[in-house]
């Protein structure tokens, strides 16, 4: 099978694509890949580092307001379609999949026009502009949230989940806890604000640190590398309790996620896919700075099923943070109910499900 993949801009579009590629390599070692992205996106460094052939096209996203820039964007889109057709003809894929971000627009559109089987994968509960546009032309739209399905033609929608979920399975949670200094018998909560950290969460944590020192559970706090020194400076003035461990970054996140009892985090699509696959209860603090407020809608999908609590950033204080953690971790029945609810939402074999959809299209 020859697979052409496109997606970029943010890790949320790139990492699911890489997880899918790794799964296909396991199931079909003869498979060949080409990844098309932009020169300036994260994908231009991440994808080649993963050993996957990479080509770039020049493209930009549409402004949401009427603008002269949109005229340039249309011109770039048309040029991107022509460049994509050239790469597609040269690579001769059996199937093309777009994982979101404006770069996959011309690539997947070009493939559809050339009669090649096409899929888009939508990670969020609120679809991006590019995937909504492409849904008119592709064969299938793979989604991760039920809420996303209503935005697409129903005959094309398949619920596959996020391939990243598959990569957190079969991890050693005890090893994960030991690696960061958590004790095995105690309950623990992991608090983090995404790969780069989040200042409002850092501020609430610093305010709460003295009260955390009185708790029976342990706290693992991840600041994000850029915030670490500032947080540690503030913590030094208040004192760092023995049951609070602070790290700038965690390199073995799947192991650590498996080991802890509760997670406090943003509500990005990849994070929620991993948490539900593992059956982890969570307190979700959606980022209010994302397009279409999609993180709050992602969180709502999990909260409504009883698998998480939602704490809006505007309501985030030391008191509300501790309150929500205590209500879950200190109540065995609540913790158990939320574990079950999260597990029912999870799709741990998401990468395999997406590969099956691809296989069916190729064999048609």
UniProtKB/Swiss-Prot annotation:
Domain of life (superkingdom): Bacteria
Subcellular location, principal: membrane
Binding positions (UDP-N-acetyl-alpha-D-glucosamine): 10-12, 124, 195, 250, 295
Broad EC category: transferase
UniProt-listed InterPro entries: GlcNAc_MurG, Glyco_trans_28_C, GlycoTrans_28_N
Keywords in alphabetical order: Cell cycle, Cell division, Cell membrane, Cell shape, Cell wall biogenesis/degradation, Glycosyltransferase, Membrane, Peptidoglycan synthesis, Transferase
Pfam families per record: Glyco_tran_28_C, Glyco_transf_28
Name of the protein in its database record: UDP-N-acetylglucosamine--N-acetylmuramyl-(pentapeptide) pyrophosphoryl-undecaprenol N-acetylglucosamine transferase 1
